Structure formats: structure tokens, C-alpha cells
């Protein structure tokens, strides 16, 4: 049977876990086998910029950081379950990638 590999990524952990829990509930209701959500390593993007716009004065810097959290879910590709997953309301800061594997 085919499997669907669902990759979820977001900068907000709460909304990410909320979407993962919705997928988990759909899997339990439809009775398909599921593994996950597996937390993947958090990607940390760091940017250091100079505070002074003209280069004069003391060298002071701002440090900015963006964290991208990811989860991986493997689920059986049952038609009924996949249709319900496609209907989930996804927040703007969450991206979902669904890949069918055999």
C-alpha cells in the first residue's frame, strides 16, 4: 500500500503542533496506520547587522534569529483520510508538503 509522507514546517511551534494533532486525529478517526509526528532538527538562521547606518561611531551590532521547526508524519495513503487532510485549515505561518511514496 502507498504511504504519504507529510512534512510540516513553521516558525511558530504552537501552530505547527496544532496542525500535527489535527492530522493525528484524522488518522485515528479513519483507522489508518500512522507514524509520527517525528520532530526534525530546528533550523536556526542568524543574521548580524550593524546598528549604525553610516559606519560612523562605535561598532555596535544587532543580532536577529529565525527558527524554523519541522515535523515529519508518515501515514497510509487512504483516499478518505487524504481528502480530510487536504481540507485542514492551515495557518499562514505553516507550510505543508505531501509526498506519495510506495
UniProtKB/Swiss-Prot annotation:
It comes from the Archaea. GO terms for molecular function: structural constituent of ribosome; tRNA binding. GO terms for cellular component: small ribosomal subunit. Keywords: Ribonucleoprotein, Ribosomal protein. PROSITE patterns: RIBOSOMAL_S10. The keyword Ribosomal protein applies. GO terms for biological process: translation. Residues 33-59 are annotated as: Disordered. Involved in the binding of tRNA to the ribosomes. Belongs to the universal ribosomal protein uS10 family. Part of the 30S ribosomal subunit. This is Small ribosomal subunit protein uS10.
Amino acid at each position: 500500500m502507498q504511504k504519504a509522507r507529510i512534512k510540516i514546517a513553521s516558525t511558530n511551534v504552537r501552530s505547527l503542533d496544532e496542525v500535527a494533532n489535527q492530522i493525528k486525529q484524522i488518522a485515528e478517526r479513519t483507522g489508518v496506520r500512522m507514524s509520527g509526528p517525528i520532530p526534525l532538527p530546528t533550523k536556526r538562521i542568524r543574521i548580524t547587522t550593524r546598528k549604525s547606518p553610516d559606519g560612523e561611531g562605535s561598532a555596535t551590532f544587532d543580532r536577529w534569529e529565525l527558527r524554523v521547526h519541522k515535523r515529519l508524519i508518515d501515514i497510509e495513503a487512504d483516499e478518505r483520510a487524504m481528502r480530510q487532510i487536504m481540507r485542514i485549515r492551515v495557518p499562514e505561518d505553516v507550510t505543508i508538503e505531501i509526498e506519495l511514496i510506495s
